[in-house]
Amino acid sequence: MPRRTDIKSILIIGAGPIVIGQACEFDYSGTQACKALKEEGFRVILVNSNPATIMTDPELADATYIEPITPEVVAKIIAKERPDALLPTMGGQTALNTALSLRRMGVLDRYNVEMIGADATAIDKAEDRALFREAMSKIGLETPKSMLANATDVKNADRKTHEAERAALKAEKPDNLDAELDALETRWNLGEGDRKQRYISHAMAIAAQALDHVGLPAIIRPSFTMGGTGGGIAYNRAEFYDIVQSGLDASPTTEVLIEESVLGWKEYEMEVVRDKADNCIIVCSIENIDPMGVHTGDSITVAPALTLTDKEYQMMRNASIAVLREIGVETGGSNVQFAVNPADGRLVVIEMNPRVSRSSALASKATGFPIAKIAAKLAVGYTLDELENDITGGATPASFEPSIDYVVTKIPRFAFEKFPGAEPVLTTAMKSVGEVMAIGRTFQESLQKALRGLETGLTGLDEIEIPGLGHGATVANHADDRNAIRAALGTPTPDRLRMVAQAIRMGTSLEDVHAMCKIDPWFLEQIAGILAMEARIREHGIPQDAVNLRMLKAMGFSDARLASLTRTDAEVVTKIREKLDVHPVYKRIDTCAAEFASPTAYMYSTYEVPFAGALANEAQVSSRKKVVILGGGPNRIGQGIEFDYCCCHAAFALRDAGYEAIMINCNPETVSTDYDTSDRLYFDPLTAEDVLEILRAEQASGELLGVIVQFGGQTPLKLADALEKAGIPILGTSPDMIDLAEDRDRFQKLLHKLGLSQPKNGIAYSVEQARLVAGELGFPLVVRPSYVLGGRAMQIIHDESMLQSYLLDTVPGLVPEDIKQKYPNDKTGQINTLLGKNPLLFDTYLSGAIEVDVDCLCDGKATFVSGILEHIEEAGIHSGDSACSLPVHSLPSELVDELERQTAALARALNVGGLMNVQYAIKDGTVYVLEVNPRASRTVPFVAKTIGRPIAKIAARIMAGETLEDAFAHYGAMPDPRNPGHIAVKEAVFPFARFPGVDILLGPEMRSTGEVMGLDRDFALAFAKSQLGAGVDLPRSGTLFVSVRDEDKKGILPAVKRLAGLGFKVLATSGTQRFLAENGVVAEKINKVLEGRPHIEDAIRNRQVQIVFNTTDGQKAVSDSKSLRRATLMQKVPYYTTLSGAAAVAEAIAALKAGSLEVRPLQEYFA
């Protein structure tokens, strides 16, 4: 079946901003889909609100819409572009839900758009819990005992009533029929919140019946959500009703499945691809080391599945294919999840995703099989046997089922430290923000590689303190000790695997460990094997012969771990290893277990002696001139997709320039680890040892021009010293200049020399010094550790008690394991040792200042300021969390001139080669330099999409030796970023709903996971789009609540008057209400939470408030208003905590009321 010729244009819906449960794996799949369909000659139309994606690069689609992904906005794009088909399977749950909404709205039928990849019936059958359960029963597959709680009958009755009202109105035929129909629709839409509450109440009554049927503990799974949003495990009735309420609220269909507990069962996933001719292949089997009860995105997983018998595997394989056939996924990839009772082998189907997923990306990277690319081609009519497998160079067709001869381990990365008050317990609702993948010839090797690739300071299965046991406890002799171990192993946490290892070290039997944690005994035996070898190393030291040292390395032991076990330095171990000529060899990911030769250079390291006739090193290093790009490792808050975008652009530009581009990274979600992004990909941890070994192999042939460390965030920068010591050339800005920008003393001298201002500041190398510096500067002040990204542990300190708490509670969380072991019982000693290496930096807090980000390109002489971004929030909120606009929207031109002058002076002084970011604060007309980052920043993709020039590509060419002018010439003339002819607004997206109990108030530590971009000719509309893209539904009418501190009352007045003038009712607390009344605004008084009921929180929970303006002052006021902020979050009420934010949203609402949003492709802005 050749590709279809009856469709010419295809709309792809992206996944939108990076959120927990839906991250950059969908940029990877969407990018593959765009390339695959363009390759086939289709006109590709893309909508995605996330500017940090490769898929939104204008060359990847014919029309690229960076617009909010809402059904209404996508409907406008369909009306404008008239696509023949819609591919909804590449953009996660966002794309599926949007596609289903478009179908329900009649948009697809109206414009004759066909859904391809998975039709609406298949999506409904897979995502609707009732339909899925019926489908599984029909084909003889068991699902856990369950019951649905929904309000389908009530919804249907409401819909019929609404349709009857429309029909009656049409029958009356009034003169103003269209206006009357619009008014009816407006009333219907405004009543959505009230209807939702009725539906939830109705479903809660059914849930009570379900509880009697299913019993406790119970699993709650909301329909049509991602990453387990709103779901969880209930162990008692109170938890049950709380989670059901949350799940019903999260589900767009107000439906949850209440399921019997299968906690402790083994969990497996199958990645399946099916074509129209019913050819089916299993791309990969995945086994979760964590048993059922932990979301698969939060579980440590391995591929292939390691503890299945062949008979069990074949049963699961056949069941997976039967599921796809019954659901009706005809063209593309799907993920099917199973649970197996280890006691009796009972197999149940948990769920399936009728689309590419997080697991699809992992399976693609684990096997080399490009699931998203193949799925896109199947969607347009091809069959698997007609498509070539790129990895084998076409030696095998895509219908050839992948086979692998290695083990892959994925470990998630968490960010609980960013959310004080959040309990670090894992459930069926996903909480991880990133993941690392490692490849080894054995499970032990891949596990230890993954642990060190996490970049959390681990060198392997490092020791850990079990809560409830004394520090350094080595034996569990007492009942209390055993109870502490049981509690630690029985509670799923990010550190549970290390707790398991520690319990085994302390003499707990494997049988007891299994009983406590339910992890399969085979995995426990493998961990015990590592620990037994650790004990031998402690006793006998580092082997002095190559055979035994190679054996240790083949088990995954890093030089740093061996050094820790023998109480020496990693450099000592490395010297012994090099003296014995023990080095890794590099193997290829080839999809066929070496059955066919693979031309694709997708490599991983391992330690083994090659068998007779085999290549010792399959890397096949070329003789070309080459550049190595270090990636960013696992995603985390503060270092995410924006840096991967920069690494990809560097690879693209260098390949275009004739260099061989070599990528090193260990993140399976990203485009940078796609097999065709670079000339050669090394999927290995970003540690000094692993990177230097790769460079050693690459230097065996050809010329290594250098290594790029400034695109991957803080991760590669930390390796700069080791690279320099090894004599490896670093391209672009020198490590010394990068260090100068981080070193407060040196940086201060540079600013003084240049005549630039900075806030009054100080530096502390000890606890005592910190107190002295704070005393000299006075409060409030900003404190942060040096050499961190994302504002890690950065705080605004208001008084002495806050400083004391920061030093004794927050700083110890930064202390690495080696320092803790050196000072086991001396917290002050630990802190002082840490600060000796990474001092604390103190700045006077510039209250009310405007913060500005400036990005620039420099070749050491010439400078181009590519963007000046004005923050909408005032200084004090981390730049990554603040909304900002490009170009500036309120700064006078003379201040912009001064910012450009200071930026150019800094770039020249630091001899920047490539990119530089400067953060400024402007107060009372004075420009203060806050910090300088002579590297890529997270604003690079946003700036590039706004000005229409790929600044990361230009920077890469500069690093390779081109001048700024020559590098720019490849991509068009230098634009004027001050007057691009349009306005772009970047807005941050937060995961607060995932962390109950956490305060949503923003500060200097970054907490957003992603971003969106609003693009328009008008600032108000661009801001409105940014809010819609971030999931904030701006009200067109309703009630505004205002409560602001005294110094903000005058400033808030214009925004309140604007909304009151648009017909909004105003509620206010007593002081604010008096002020508003004195200034001509009618406002109704309402109680604060502490003033008695009914109070403002009651009004918000009763959906009587549609938007909130609230500013606070001082710790007590912040604390007192926390419950108010949580209420707005849970009720999805827009909440603005700054004067500038309030002013911007008031203008945005006015613009929306004045007319509808227009949509334009990126290409139209730069035509």
From Swiss-Prot:
InterPro entries in UniProt: ATP-grasp, CarbamoylP_synth_lsu, CarbamoylP_synth_lsu_oligo, CarbamoylP_synth_lsu_oligo_sf, CbamoylP_synth_lsu-like_ATP-bd, CbamoylP_synth_lsu_CPSase_dom, MerR-type_HTH_dom, MGS-like_dom
Pathway membership: Amino-acid biosynthesis; L-arginine biosynthesis; carbamoyl phosphate from bicarbonate: step 1/1; Pyrimidine metabolism; UMP biosynthesis via de novo pathway; (S)-dihydroorotate from bicarbonate: step 1/3
Domain named MGS-like: residues: 1032-1167
Binding-site residues, Mg(2+) 1: Q337, E351
Gene Ontology molecular function terms on file: ATP binding; carbamoyl-phosphate synthase (ammonia) activity; carbamoyl-phosphate synthase (glutamine-hydrolyzing) activity; DNA binding; metal ion binding
Cofactor binding comment, as recorded: Binds 4 Mg(2+) or Mn(2+) ions per subunit.
Role this protein plays: Large subunit of the glutamine-dependent carbamoyl phosphate synthetase (CPSase). CPSase catalyzes the formation of carbamoyl phosphate from the ammonia moiety of glutamine, carbonate, and phosphate donated by ATP, constituting the first step of 2 biosynthetic pathways, one leading to arginine and/or urea and the other to pyrimidine nucleotides.
Stated name of the protein: Carbamoyl phosphate synthase large chain
Organism, as annotated: Mesorhizobium japonicum (strain LMG 29417 / CECT 9101 / MAFF 303099)
Gene (UniProt): carB
